[in-house]
A protein has these predicted regions:
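Short, glycine-/small-residue-rich phosphate/pyrophosphate-handling segment
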Residues: 92-143
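Mobile gating loops/cap/lid regions near enzyme active sites that modulate substrate access
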Residues: 143-150
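N-terminal beta1-alpha1-beta2 submodule of the flavodoxin-like/Rossmannoid cofactor-binding fold
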Residues: 1-90, 150-182
């Protein structure tokens, strides 16, 4: 999902930094889930997000798996580390949006995106959800962001519906950020 959003942002004219947050879960817990372990192994060399990355950006698209209807602890930890930047007002007036994935259709996708946005309210950020601004949103059905159901084994591939929704979200975020920047 993140790679698709990054590519769509670039196609919309943005300079993009694709980052991940540091993995904080113990290795034995990760090893107990084959899909998670594989993901960690394939992304281990990707750059971890820093405060400088969010300061650099005019717009931020956060992606997180859903954990019990909430933001994953790794992303929450990154957001919590931005207290100094928040206190200095450096996170305000940026565009923010989110995307998520769950194993089940009612696995907390909307509550996760809403919880993610709680920090953005405190930042003074500008949340740019997709809403129902394009007919394709009636197919994916999530006005708060984009969500994907991975299935019980976390292996369900993204569909054209989700690819289109991710493209729309990224394009919308880039467009609105550009309008705000002038």
């Amino acid at each position: 999902m993140a790679e698709r959003v990054a590519a769509a942002g670039e196609r919309a004219g943005a300079e993009v930094r694709l980052r991940q947050v540091a993995e904080t879960v113990p290795r034995d817990v990760i090893a107990s889930n084959a899909a998670w372990s594989n993901h960690v192994d394939t992304t281990r060399n990707g750059p971890d997000a820093t405060a400088d990355d969010i300061l650099w950006a005019d717009a931020v698209l956060f992606g997180t798996p859903t954990r019990f209807g909430n933001v994953a602890s790794q992303l929450k930890g990154y957001i919590d580390s931005l207290g100094g930047q928040w206190a200095a007002g450096q996170l305000a007036d940026k565009v923010y949006a989110g995307f998520t994935a769950t194993q089940t259709a009612h696995g907390g996708q909307e509550s996760t995106l809403l919880a993610l946005y709680n920090a953005v309210y405190h930042f003074g950020g500008i949340i740019v959800p997709p809403g129902y601004t394009d007919p394709l949103k009636f197919a994916d059905g999530n006005p708060y962001g984009v969500s994907h159901v991975t299935g019980p084994s976390n292996s369900a591939p993204l569909t054209d519906v989700e690819f289109n929704a991710l493209d729309h979200l990224a394009t919308r975020v880039v467009t609105i950020a550009g309008r705000l920047k002038g």
